[in-house]
């Protein structure tokens, strides 16, 4: 019962209202069980994936929906309206993002140096799956995070995965009257020169 997939499961055999209720109940169950610790202050995180000798590290944090609207976040795929609407309704009802949009940015030595500096701290999570995919997470120290935010302020990024989620988030932001609550989406930013994707 303590698996986040229950929060995002479509359960297409159920009516929409029942699906939403089941998703909300699954989320409440996770919170009640203490599955997540509360982060009181805003923070950036590093998420590193290591598999078969390849290592890539993402900067994880909130991305402004305005950056998508003004062209700093650049899509390269068309989206299907019904899929984006389905995700928008889910986000509106659940109120949280289920997974980050993956973004790529042009290689940057200054960014890489700050990432390496942040990785000198103790990771908050470090584990390996049965398929040998190793995952490590660090909280970025505030002084390093401030420098990263400045470097990314006007940097263009490209959507690698998550076009429908980005579209859905923009829709919900509009529906809400562009309120602060829905003005951001969770993003994972990878250096394009180190990015590895697999169709498997």
Ranges and model annotations:
Residues 86-103, 108-151:
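Phosphate/anion-contacting hairpin/loop surfaces
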Residues 14, 110-111, 166-167, 194-195:
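Flexible loop/turn segments at secondary-structure boundaries
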Residues 72-79, 136-139, 155-157:
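Flexible, glycine/proline-enriched loop segments at strand-loop-helix junctions
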Residues 64, 105-107, 161, 170, ...:
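Short, structured patches in soluble enzyme cores that scaffold and shape functional sites
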Residues 196-200:
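Conserved small/polar residues in nucleotide/adenosyl-binding loops
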Residues 179-195:
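ADP-ribosyltransferase catalytic core
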Residues 1-113:
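N-terminal extension/subdomain marker
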Residues 138-184:
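Active-site beta-strand/loop microenvironment that shapes enzyme catalytic pockets
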């Amino acid at each position: 019962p303590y698996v986040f997939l229950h929060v995002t499961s479509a359960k297409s055999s159920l009516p929409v209202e029942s699906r939403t209720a089941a998703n909300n109940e699954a989320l409440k169950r996770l919170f009640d069980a203490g599955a997540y610790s509360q982060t009181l202050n805003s923070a950036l995180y590093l998420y590193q994936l290591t598999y078969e000798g390849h290592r890539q590290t993402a900067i994880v944090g909130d991305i402004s929906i305005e950056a998508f609207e003004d062209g700093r976040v650049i899509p390269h795929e068309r989206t299907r309206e019904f899929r984006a609407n389905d995700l928008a309704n889910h986000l509106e009802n659940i109120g949280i993002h289920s997974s980050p949009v993956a973004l790529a940015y042009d290689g940057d030595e200054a960014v890489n140096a700050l990432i390496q500096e942040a990785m000198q701290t103790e990771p908050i999570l470090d584990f390996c799956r049965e398929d040998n995919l190793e995952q490590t997470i660090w909280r970025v120290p505030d002084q390093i995070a401030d420098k990263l935010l400045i470097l990314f302020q006007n940097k263009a990024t490209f959507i690698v995965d998550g076009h429908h989620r980005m579209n859905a988030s923009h829709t919900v932001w509009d529906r809400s009257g562009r309120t602060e609550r829905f003005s951001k989406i969770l993003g994972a930013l990878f250096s394009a020169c180190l990015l590895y994707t697999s169709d498997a």
